From Swiss-Prot:
Any single biological process term in GO: negative regulation of DNA-templated transcription
SUPFAM superfamilies in UniProt: LexA/Signal peptidase, Winged helix' DNA-binding domain
E.C. numbers: 3.4.21.88
Pfam families in the cross-refs: LexA_DNA_bind (PF01726), Peptidase_S24 (PF00717)
Keyword Coiled coil: no
Function: Represses a number of genes involved in the response to DNA damage (SOS response), including recA and lexA. In the presence of single-stranded DNA, RecA interacts with LexA causing an autocatalytic cleavage which disrupts the DNA-binding part of LexA, leading to derepression of the SOS regulon and eventually DNA repair.
InterPro entries assigned to the protein according to its UniProt record, in alphabetical order: LexA, LexA-like, LexA/Signal_pep-like_sf, LexA_DNA-bd_dom, LexA_repressor, Peptidase_S24_LexA, Peptidase_S24_S26A/B/C, WH-like_DNA-bd_sf
Keyword check for DNA-binding: yes
Coiled-coil annotated residue ranges, if any: none
Subunit structure: Homodimer.
GO molecular function, one term: DNA binding
Protein name according to UniProt: LexA repressor
Length: 206
């Protein structure tokens, strides 16, 4: 691969991080906004340069028509990543959060799992999610009432049952010793990181 300019390297890293965080590449307008370009056309010129160097593939006719070529995918780790401590403001799937990889077939869960999260505490014990379990999580950004979610409230990550009423979100524990977490979206930050789709305990499928 031909060497990249610092700006091209910055854009390529942004594309990779956006795919890891949301499952999709950024639009030209999003790239321009995040990197301070005056217009989406400026971002387009950098994307064309990256495509010429073989770093990305551009699919015409769609705003998110950016794809990483197969040969650029990192195959040094396989399986599902186990996410450890999550840094404030960082995507949950950022490489620095990955403790290790488990050789688990994501398709064994429905919907398929994207990552694993180690359970801390007993707030969900009544539905069999226990301290030390590995929770299989399907990456989504929205949830329906009643679903068990991995949510980030401000900068704290928690596993709870989701309920939304207007501008208020309640994150319910499955343990009578815990009160619901109340989030007022008018001034608090809430991010849905994924849905709980299964549990691994002591190497067994539950």
């Amino acid at each position: 691969m031909r060497p990249l300019t610092p700006r091209q390297a910055e854009i390529l890293e942004l594309i990779k991080r956006n795919i890891a965080e949301t499952g999709m590449p950024p639009t030209r307008a999003e790239i321009a906004t995040r990197l301070g370009f005056k217009s989406a056309n400026a971002a387009e010129e950098h994307l064309k340069a990256l495509a010429k160097k073989g770093c990305i593939e551009i699919m015409p006719g769609t705003s998110r028509g950016i794809r990483l070529p197969v040969e650029e995918e990192d195959n040094s780790e396989t399986g599902l990543p186990l996410i450890g401590q999550v840094a404030a403001g960082e995507p949950i799937l950022a490489q620095e959060h990955v403790e290790q990889y488990y050789q688990v077939d994501p398709s064994m869960f429905h919907p398929s799992a994207d990552f694993l999260l180690r359970v801390k505490g007993d707030s969900m014990k009544n539905i069999g999610i226990l301290e030390g379990d590995l929770l299989a999580v399907h990456k989504v950004q929205q949830a329906r009432n009643g679903q068990v979610v991995v949510a980030r409230v401000d900068d704290d990550v928690t596993v709870k049952r989701f309920e939304k009423k207007g501008n208020l979100v309640y994150l319910h524990a499955e343990n009578e010793d815990y009160s619901p977490i109340k989030v007022d979206l008018s001034f608090q930050s809430l991010t849905i990181e994924g849905l709980a789709v299964g549990v691994i305990r002591n190497g067994d499928w539950l």
